[in-house]
């Protein structure tokens, strides 16, 4: 899925650009969380249409787990609208649920990566306030 944006210059200057913590997925969610933190409203225009020129392709299970679990967890940890401890607790539970759902230990491996990133996540959360 791709996002198509209409953002004022003022909002872009106040909220900032995409975070470098998100190499590809999760940027849009993180930016919207930060915009809400700064008092901006985020909306969807159901009648708007845009085309994202991307061919459908099957993805390996590992890539789906990475995108759905790891990037989703990273978005949650970076949400400056809620305390980090609350987000971390949520991600701990989310890890267990996803491991059972996928029948895989990959969420636990990704969880370790997220724990190692906590200092950088704390720094990013502070920088975007």
Task: Describe the predicted segments one by one.
Residues 1-16, 21-49:
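A short, conserved alpha-helix in the catalytic core of glycosyltransferases
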Residues 16, 35-36, 55, 60, ...:
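Short, function-defining helix-loop hinge/capping sites that tune catalysis or transport
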Residues 16-20, 55, 97, 101:
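A broad detector of the eukaryotic-type serine/threonine protein kinase catalytic domain
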Residues 25, 48, 55, 61-63, ...:
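A generic "cationic amphipathic patch" detector
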Residues 37-41, 51-72:
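Nucleotide-sugar-dependent glycosyltransferase catalytic core
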Residues 64-73, 79, 83-129:
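Non-catalytic, C-terminal membrane-associated alpha-helical segments of glycosyltransferases
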């Amino acid at each position: 899925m791709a996002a198509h944006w209409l953002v004022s210059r003022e909002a872009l200057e106040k909220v900032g650009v995409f975070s470098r913590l998100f190499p590809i997925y999760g940027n849009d969610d993180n930016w919207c969380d930060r915009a809400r933190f700064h008092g901006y409203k985020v909306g969807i225009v159901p009648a708007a249409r845009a085309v994202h020129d991307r061919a459908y392709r099957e993805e390996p299970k590992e890539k789906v787990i990475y995108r759905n679990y790891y990037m989703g967890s990273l978005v949650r940890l970076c949400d400056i609208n809620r305390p980090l401890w609350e987000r971390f607790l949520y991600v701990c539970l989310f890890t267990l649920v996803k491991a059972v759902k996928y029948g895989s230990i990959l969420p636990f491996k990704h969880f370790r990566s997220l724990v190692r990133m906590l200092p950088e996540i704390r720094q990013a959360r502070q920088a975007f306030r």
